[in-house]
Amino acid sequence: MSAIERITKAAHLIDMNDIIREGNPTLRAIAEEVTFPLSDQEIILGEKMMQFLKHSQDPVMAEKMGLRGGVGLAAPQLDISKRIIAVLVPNIVEEGETPQEAYDLEAIMYNPKIVSHSVQDAALGEGEGCLSVDRNVPGYVVRHARVTVDYFDKDGEKHRIKLKGYNSIVVQHEIDHINGIMFYDRINEKDPFAVKDGLLILE
Protein backbone atom coordinates (compact mmCIF):
# COMPACT_ATOMS: atom_id res chain seq x y z
CA MET A 1 0.00 0.00 0.00
CA SER A 2 1.41 3.41 -0.96
CA ALA A 3 1.87 6.16 1.63
CA ILE A 4 -0.98 8.23 0.18
CA GLU A 5 -3.36 5.23 0.20
CA ARG A 6 -2.54 4.49 3.84
CA ILE A 7 -2.66 8.08 5.07
CA THR A 8 -5.94 8.97 3.32
CA LYS A 9 -7.88 6.03 4.75
CA ALA A 10 -10.96 7.38 6.56
CA ALA A 11 -9.92 6.28 10.06
CA HIS A 12 -6.24 7.24 9.77
CA LEU A 13 -4.86 10.12 11.84
CA ILE A 14 -1.40 11.32 10.82
CA ASP A 15 1.12 10.86 13.63
CA MET A 16 4.90 11.00 14.03
CA ASN A 17 5.26 7.48 12.59
CA ASP A 18 4.00 8.77 9.24
CA ILE A 19 6.65 11.48 9.06
CA ILE A 20 9.88 10.45 7.36
CA ARG A 21 13.20 11.68 8.74
CA GLU A 22 16.27 13.28 7.20
CA GLY A 23 18.23 10.82 5.09
CA ASN A 24 15.12 9.60 3.26
CA PRO A 25 15.60 10.43 -0.45
CA THR A 26 12.01 11.74 -0.81
CA LEU A 27 13.06 14.77 1.27
CA ARG A 28 15.72 15.60 -1.34
CA ALA A 29 13.54 15.16 -4.43
CA ILE A 30 11.79 17.91 -6.38
CA ALA A 31 8.13 17.10 -5.75
CA GLU A 32 5.67 16.80 -8.63
CA GLU A 33 3.04 19.41 -9.35
CA VAL A 34 -0.55 18.33 -8.82
CA THR A 35 -3.00 18.65 -11.70
CA PHE A 36 -6.57 19.91 -11.53
CA PRO A 37 -9.18 18.76 -10.88
CA LEU A 38 -7.52 17.16 -7.86
CA SER A 39 -8.12 13.53 -7.01
CA ASP A 40 -10.18 12.78 -3.90
CA GLN A 41 -6.96 11.41 -2.36
CA GLU A 42 -5.14 14.73 -2.86
CA ILE A 43 -7.99 16.70 -1.29
CA ILE A 44 -8.21 14.31 1.67
CA LEU A 45 -4.41 14.40 2.07
CA GLY A 46 -4.46 18.20 2.41
CA GLU A 47 -7.26 18.01 4.98
CA LYS A 48 -5.43 15.31 6.97
CA MET A 49 -2.24 17.38 6.96
CA MET A 50 -4.14 20.34 8.41
CA GLN A 51 -5.82 18.04 10.95
CA PHE A 52 -2.36 16.86 12.06
CA LEU A 53 -1.21 20.46 12.64
CA LYS A 54 -4.32 21.20 14.72
CA HIS A 55 -3.79 18.02 16.77
CA SER A 56 -0.09 18.89 17.25
CA GLN A 57 -1.04 22.31 18.67
CA ASP A 58 -3.71 20.92 20.99
CA PRO A 59 -1.97 19.98 24.28
CA VAL A 60 -4.40 17.13 25.03
CA MET A 61 -4.30 15.56 21.55
CA ALA A 62 -0.56 16.11 21.19
CA GLU A 63 0.15 14.27 24.43
CA LYS A 64 -2.31 11.49 23.64
CA MET A 65 -0.85 10.95 20.16
CA GLY A 66 2.79 11.69 21.05
CA LEU A 67 3.06 14.58 18.59
CA ARG A 68 5.66 17.30 18.29
CA GLY A 69 4.07 20.70 17.81
CA GLY A 70 4.14 21.96 14.24
CA VAL A 71 3.06 25.01 12.25
CA GLY A 72 3.65 23.52 8.82
CA LEU A 73 3.77 20.19 7.01
CA ALA A 74 4.67 19.30 3.43
CA ALA A 75 3.55 16.17 1.57
CA PRO A 76 7.16 14.98 0.99
CA GLN A 77 7.52 14.68 4.79
CA LEU A 78 4.88 11.94 4.54
CA ASP A 79 6.87 10.21 1.77
CA ILE A 80 4.45 11.63 -0.82
CA SER A 81 6.34 13.57 -3.49
CA LYS A 82 3.62 16.08 -4.39
CA ARG A 83 3.61 19.89 -4.20
CA ILE A 84 1.15 20.16 -1.31
CA ILE A 85 1.74 22.02 1.96
CA ALA A 86 -0.36 22.92 4.99
CA VAL A 87 0.42 25.86 7.28
CA LEU A 88 -1.24 26.73 10.57
CA VAL A 89 0.18 29.67 12.53
CA PRO A 90 -1.70 30.48 15.75
CA ASN A 91 -2.48 34.05 16.70
CA ILE A 92 -0.24 35.09 19.58
CA VAL A 93 -1.93 37.57 21.91
CA GLU A 94 -1.03 39.20 25.20
CA GLU A 95 -1.96 37.16 28.26
CA GLY A 96 -5.59 37.66 29.19
CA GLU A 97 -6.60 38.89 25.74
CA THR A 98 -8.83 36.93 23.38
CA PRO A 99 -7.67 36.82 19.75
CA GLN A 100 -10.07 37.94 17.03
CA GLU A 101 -9.10 34.85 15.04
CA ALA A 102 -7.59 31.64 16.38
CA TYR A 103 -5.06 31.49 13.54
CA ASP A 104 -2.93 34.16 11.92
CA LEU A 105 -2.41 31.94 8.87
CA GLU A 106 -4.38 28.80 7.99
CA ALA A 107 -4.06 27.38 4.49
CA ILE A 108 -3.72 24.18 2.48
CA MET A 109 -1.70 25.14 -0.59
CA TYR A 110 -1.43 23.17 -3.82
CA ASN A 111 1.50 24.01 -6.14
CA PRO A 112 2.64 26.97 -4.00
CA LYS A 113 5.26 29.18 -5.62
CA ILE A 114 7.21 32.25 -4.51
CA VAL A 115 6.66 34.80 -7.28
CA SER A 116 8.52 37.74 -5.72
CA HIS A 117 10.52 38.52 -2.60
CA SER A 118 12.20 41.32 -0.73
CA VAL A 119 15.87 42.18 -1.12
CA GLN A 120 16.10 42.10 2.68
CA ASP A 121 16.74 38.75 4.34
CA ALA A 122 15.45 37.55 7.71
CA ALA A 123 16.04 34.72 10.16
CA LEU A 124 14.40 33.51 13.34
CA GLY A 125 16.49 34.46 16.36
CA GLU A 126 15.96 31.04 17.92
CA GLY A 127 16.69 29.17 14.69
CA GLU A 128 14.37 26.65 13.06
CA GLY A 129 13.31 23.09 13.72
CA CYS A 130 11.61 20.48 11.58
CA LEU A 131 9.36 17.49 12.21
CA SER A 132 11.65 15.48 9.90
CA VAL A 133 14.78 16.40 11.89
CA ASP A 134 15.13 14.88 15.34
CA ARG A 135 18.28 16.81 16.26
CA ASN A 136 18.84 20.43 17.19
CA VAL A 137 20.68 22.33 14.45
CA PRO A 138 21.68 25.78 15.78
CA GLY A 139 22.20 28.77 13.53
CA TYR A 140 20.40 31.48 11.60
CA VAL A 141 18.35 30.07 8.71
CA VAL A 142 18.60 32.92 6.21
CA ARG A 143 15.40 33.50 4.21
CA HIS A 144 13.59 36.36 2.45
CA ALA A 145 12.03 38.84 4.88
CA ARG A 146 8.93 39.22 2.69
CA VAL A 147 7.49 37.01 -0.04
CA THR A 148 4.54 36.97 -2.42
CA VAL A 149 3.20 33.45 -2.91
CA ASP A 150 0.81 32.09 -5.54
CA TYR A 151 -1.01 28.84 -4.79
CA PHE A 152 -4.17 26.94 -5.65
CA ASP A 153 -6.85 25.74 -3.25
CA LYS A 154 -8.59 22.36 -3.46
CA ASP A 155 -11.13 23.75 -5.94
CA GLY A 156 -8.43 24.95 -8.32
CA GLU A 157 -8.91 28.62 -7.43
CA LYS A 158 -5.69 30.64 -7.60
CA HIS A 159 -4.69 32.81 -4.64
CA ARG A 160 -1.91 35.35 -4.15
CA ILE A 161 -0.78 36.27 -0.65
CA LYS A 162 1.87 38.65 0.65
CA LEU A 163 3.67 37.44 3.76
CA LYS A 164 6.16 38.95 6.18
CA GLY A 165 7.65 38.05 9.55
CA TYR A 166 7.05 34.61 11.00
CA ASN A 167 4.35 33.66 8.45
CA SER A 168 6.80 34.32 5.64
CA ILE A 169 9.42 32.08 7.28
CA VAL A 170 6.94 29.22 7.83
CA VAL A 171 5.73 29.18 4.23
CA GLN A 172 9.29 29.39 2.84
CA HIS A 173 10.30 26.44 5.06
CA GLU A 174 7.45 24.33 3.64
CA ILE A 175 8.06 25.38 0.03
CA ASP A 176 11.70 24.34 0.54
CA HIS A 177 10.44 20.83 1.37
CA ILE A 178 8.72 20.47 -2.01
CA ASN A 179 11.99 21.58 -3.64
CA GLY A 180 14.17 19.05 -1.80
CA ILE A 181 15.75 21.65 0.50
CA MET A 182 16.22 21.21 4.26
CA PHE A 183 16.33 24.22 6.60
CA TYR A 184 19.94 23.59 7.64
CA ASP A 185 21.07 23.96 4.02
CA ARG A 186 20.49 27.70 4.57
CA ILE A 187 22.69 27.96 7.70
CA ASN A 188 26.21 29.33 7.19
CA GLU A 189 28.37 26.24 7.71
CA LYS A 190 31.50 28.10 8.82
CA ASP A 191 29.73 30.63 11.04
CA PRO A 192 26.14 29.54 11.88
CA PHE A 193 25.29 32.83 13.59
CA ALA A 194 26.87 35.13 11.02
CA VAL A 195 24.86 38.32 10.51
CA LYS A 196 25.38 39.97 7.15
CA ASP A 197 24.39 43.59 6.54
CA GLY A 198 20.66 44.14 6.64
CA LEU A 199 19.71 40.71 8.03
CA LEU A 200 16.52 41.07 10.05
CA ILE A 201 16.52 38.87 13.17
CA LEU A 202 12.96 37.94 14.14
CA GLU A 203 12.58 37.35 17.88
Curated annotation (Swiss-Prot):
It catalyses: N-terminal N-formyl-L-methionyl-[peptide] + H2O = N-terminal L-methionyl-[peptide] + formate. The keyword Ligase does not apply. Fe cation binds at residues 130, 173, 177. Keywords: Hydrolase, Iron, Metal-binding, Protein biosynthesis. GO terms for molecular function: metal ion binding; peptide deformylase activity. Pfam families: Pep_deformylase (PF01327). Binds 1 Fe(2+) ion. InterPro entries: Peptide_deformylase, Peptide_deformylase_sf. HAMAP family: Pep_deformylase. Belongs to the polypeptide deformylase family. This is Peptide deformylase. It comes from Streptococcus pneumoniae serotype 4 (strain ATCC BAA-334 / TIGR4). The lineage of its organism: Bacteria, Bacillati, Bacillota, Bacilli, Lactobacillales.
